[in-house]
Swiss-Prot record:
It comes from Arabidopsis thaliana. The keyword Hydrolase applies. This is Probable pectinesterase/pectinesterase inhibitor 35. It catalyses: [(1->4)-alpha-D-galacturonosyl methyl ester](n) + n H2O = [(1->4)-alpha-D-galacturonosyl](n) + n methanol + n H(+). Gene3D superfamilies: Invertase/pectin methylesterase inhibitor family protein (1.20.140.40), Single-stranded right-handed beta-helix, Pectin lyase-like (2.160.20.10). The keyword Cell wall biogenesis/degradation applies.
Length: 529
């Protein structure tokens, strides 16, 4: 991965800000931990509705202490980022294997800095609880991911150890900030728009920040699009590779559209966090194909193995097939990794074996998309809803597969996997999921489940790990594999969610989709069917 430079939206970290952060570090530590000692940070309930997002403004009670806590996290993230960046400069000609996870941490720290900056410095009036909750949850996930990338290398030098230490310290600070936020968060949640109903694109649905020209663009068919770039392998477009087209996009806040004409593109692509609102439009599943073959067995860590990685907020993919062709014996091999907030994948295909789709972080929505794999082929720690998708377990090197491995590491994170009105099928014995992290959260609702799913439904990760703290649930499913009579009896498993509980995992209740999905032009069901 190329080293990225951190830039703030419409701002740059200058020398004065650097000095300001340094001078404030010790005083912030004192004020934050004094606040911590006088506060009881109660964990939110495992009940899904207790952390369903409300569209209210953040609470002003204890706001100063909370912002000081986030500022302290921002300071530490900046120091860690500086350390990682300096390490890449001093070791560019050596220790290239060690630099892979360092570059991962560098990119993740850039993303974290951007989110924390928005909370502390910008403090825009339209930032609501769901935004702040999402950013803090994602920032915490970023540090967990950095540590995971570092751990996948068998050894690294003292600088790498220092980065790992910074990541662990930052994890603690972010956990504290998240605790403070949730304890102060208003508990009221809107009950409107939870009764279901298909939501279609209409003019009044667009938020004020979507321009009229963008609305017309997002409503348009491929033939009507006026893309900023056209990729064609035969040279008939503006570019012959997707990477060239991405590099040609001008910086700005508007939507950038790239049309990928029918063909197979053998590339590994990274859309960094600073490249926002990118829309990739193909000519259809199986017609426009992006394929890579990186894998853990081939020397790439999980994060870097992705054929396509989208970190910039507002990412949209439509009518494209994403493939990792590494094969069933290659261990972790990601076809698509998404860490983009308010992202949409529509009418696409994601094809791999182990770890096909990495839903890394933030709010995501998948509609009418086929996802194929073997072990943990949907994993990560985003807040994600799958609707009208085909989840297909294929034959691999093992005799049993797992559809999901959700990675929620803190009970205050507003993350999880919601599979709604989908088809789950397979050609080998398969489990709906297993807990990758302590507070793993996954629900399957109003979906068809075929006979490939094991009667127990869910599998442990290792022994009794997370069986009491996970949250797994089912609601209104059908098909030969949908019976809950033989399911696991774990404390964290809910065989029959109530109507109210299930509503908490819908598009409107879980990812606040009514506020942003209309602007994308995608059809979606806001509530239960």
């Amino acid at each position: 991965m190329a080293t990225t430079s951190f830039s703030l939206p419409n701002h740059k970290f200058g020398i004065k800000l650097m000095l300001f952060l340094v001078l404030n570090l010790l005083s912030l530590q004192t004020s934050v931990f004094a606040h911590s000692s006088n506060s009881k940070f109660t964990k939110i309930s495992r009940h899904p509705n207790s952390d369903s997002s409300s569209r209210t403004k953040p609470s002003t009670s204890s706001n100063k202490g909370f912002l000081s806590s986030v500022q302290l996290s921002l300071d530490h993230a900046l120091f860690a980022r500086s350390l990682a960046f300096n390490l890449t400069l001093s070791h560019r000609t050596s220790q290239t294997l060690m630099l892979d996870p360092v570059n991962d941490c560098l990119e993740l720290l850039d993303d974290t800095l951007d989110m924390l900056y928005r909370i502390v410095v910008i403090k825009r009036k339209d930032h609501v609880n769901d935004d702040v909750h999402t950013w803090l949850s994602a920032a915490l996930t970023n540090q967990e991911t950095c540590k995971q990338s570092l751990s996948e290398k068998s050894s690294f030098n003292k600088e790498g150890i220092a980065i790992d230490s910074f990541a662990r310290n930052l994890t603690g600070l972010l956990t504290n900030s998240l605790d403070m936020f949730v304890s102060d968060k208003q508990k009221s949640s809107s009950s409107s728009n939870l009764t279901g109903g298909r939501k279609l694109l209409s003019d009044h649905d667009f938020p004020t920040w979507v321009s009229s020209s963008d609305r017309k663009l997002l409503e348009a068919s491929v033939e009507e699009l006026r893309p900023h770039a056209v990729v064609a392998a035969d040279g008939s477009g503006t570019h012959m590779s997707v990477a060239e087209a991405l590099a040609s996009l001008e910086k700005g806040s508007g939507r950038s559209v790239i049309h990928l004409t029918a063909g197979t593109y053998k590339e590994n692509l990274n859309i960094p966090s600073k490249q926002k609102n990118v829309m990739l439009v193909g000519d259809g599943k199986g017609k426009t194909v992006i394929v890579g073959s990186r894998s853990n067995r081939g020397g790439w860590n999980t994060y870097q193995s992705a054929t396509v990685a989208a970190m910039g907020d507002g990412f949209i993919a439509r009518d494209i097939t994403f493939v990792n062709s590494a094969g069933p014996n290659s261990e972790q091999a990601v076809a698509l990794r998404v860490g983009s907030d308010r992202s949409v994948v529509y009418r696409c295909s994601i094809d791999g074996y182990q770890d096909s789709l990495y839903t890394l972080s933030k709010r995501q929505f998948y509609r009418e998309t086929d996802i194929t794999g073997t072990v943990d082929f949907i994993f990560g720690n985003s807040a994600v809803v799958f609707q009208s998708c085909n989840l297909v377990s294929r034959k691999g090197s093992s005799d049993q597969n797992y559809v999901t491995a959700q990675g929620r590491s803190d009970p205050n994170q507003n993350t999880g996997i919601s599979i709604h009105n989908c088809r789950i099928t397979g050609s080998t014995k398969t489990y709906l999921g297993r807990p990758w992290k302590q507070y793993s959260r996954t629900v399957v609702m109003q979906s068809f489940i075929d006979g490939s799913i094991h009667p127990s439904g869910w599998s442990p990760w290792s022994s009794n790990f997370a069986l009491k703290t996970l949250y797994y649930g089912e609601f209104g499913n059908s098909g030969p594999g949908s019976s809950v009579s033989g399911r696991v009896s774990w404390a964290g498993y809910h065989p029959a969610l109530t109507l109210t509980e299930a509503q908490g995992f819908t598009v409107s209740g879980f990812i606040d989709g009514n506020s942003w999905l209309p602007s994308t032009g995608v059809v979606f069901d806001s509530g239960l069917l």
